[in-house]
A protein has these predicted regions:
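C-terminal alpha-helical cap of glycosyltransferases
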Residues: 232-251
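Donor-nucleotide binding loops and adjacent catalytic segments primarily
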Residues: 66-67, 74-149, 182-185, 190, ...
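A short, well-ordered alpha-helix in the C-terminal region of glycosyltransferases
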Residues: 219-233
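Acidic donor-binding loop of glycosyltransferase active sites
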Residues: 144-159, 166-167
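Structural loop-to-beta junction motif characteristic of Rossmann-like glycosyltransferase folds
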Residues: 9-10, 147-148, 165-173, 193
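Short alpha-helical segment that forms part of, or immediately flanks, the ligand-binding pocket
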Residues: 2, 140, 158-166, 186
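Short loop/helix-cap segments at secondary-structure boundaries that form the rim of catalytic
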Residues: 25-28, 40-49, 121-129, 143-144, ...
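Active-site-proximal region of nucleotide-activated glycan assembly enzymes
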Residues: 5-66
Length: 251
């Protein structure tokens, strides 16, 4: 980017997290345009260069065909929850989730537990209630039929839940650089658009209590309403237009 700047080549960067990383902060002094996923990020960059565009993942998931909970043997009589800790899964969370799963017995909701491909075999000894299905991975299209998701809070996940106005319980990974996931989730929680349960506080009592709270009508509707503030369904198109403005020297 710096070399391109010296050569007179137009440059644009996109910051996916709510609190920018060191690289983009440094590059912001050299590039022509800065696109951000969170309104809160604008304060960290030169005002004249910065535009709030959201994350292109929003547009991608909205264009997907809707997955059906029936594919997992679930119905529409009860709420449908997805519990996922990333595509690979998490060793720490696997231990906690194995203890949690039997507690879903007799609950009036259905739970799809996505283990991640690295830890699926670890669940073979778990006594699984009839309202729980355990799978190694899933397609994000099933988020479109979910009532609640319990998940990490990486930039792509934030883009997905905000695009779908999907209430969530975020469990930020404490192992990422600069604690980005917690900061992403906190941006939503501060606007009452999600719930946060830190990994160190994760236990079946805390999670079950949060699930019950999320399904209270007034809480659920408030989260969906507040998620609209973060939703950018035309993100990719907006970024494309900014790129073309640079190409045409219209900035």
């Amino acid at each position: 980017m710096v070399a391109a700047n010296h050569l007179g080549i137009k440059t644009i960067i996109h910051e996916q997290n709510s609190i920018p990383g060191v690289s983009n902060k440094l590059l912001s002094h050299f590039v022509n345009k800065i696109c951000v996923s969170f309104k809160e990020s604008e304060a960290y960059f030169p005002k004249k260069k910065t535009i709030y565009t959201g994350n292109p993942r929003s547009e991608e998931i909205l264009s997907m065909e809707k997955g059906k909970r029936e594919d997992f043997g679930f119905n529409h009589k009860s709420k449908f929850i997805i519990l996922v800790m990333g595509s690979l899964g998490s060793l720490t969370m696997t231990k906690k989730m194995k203890e949690l799963i039997p507690s879903f017995k007799d609950k009036d909701y259905q739970v799809l537990v996505v283990t991640g491909k690295n830890y699926y075999d670890d669940y073979k000894d778990v006594k699984t209630p009839t309202n729980v299905k355990i799978v190694p991975f899933y397609d994000a299209k099933y988020m479109k039929d979910a009532d609640l998701i319990i998940t990490r809070s990486g930039a792509s996940t934030i883009a997905e839940v905000t695009a779908l106005l999907l209430p969530s319980i975020m469990i930020p990974s404490p192992y990422v650089t600069h604690n980005h996931q917690y900061k992403n989730a906190k941006a939503l929680e501060d606007k009452k658009a999600c719930k946060i349960l830190e990994e160190k506080d994760f236990c079946k009592e805390n999670l079950l209590s949060l699930i019950d709270d999320c399904f209270k009508k007034e809480v659920y509707n408030e989260m969906r309403k507040n998620l609209k503030e973060f939703s950018c369904p035309n993100s990719a198109e907006t970024i494309y237009k900014e790129i073309m403005r640079l190409v045409r020297n219209e900035e």
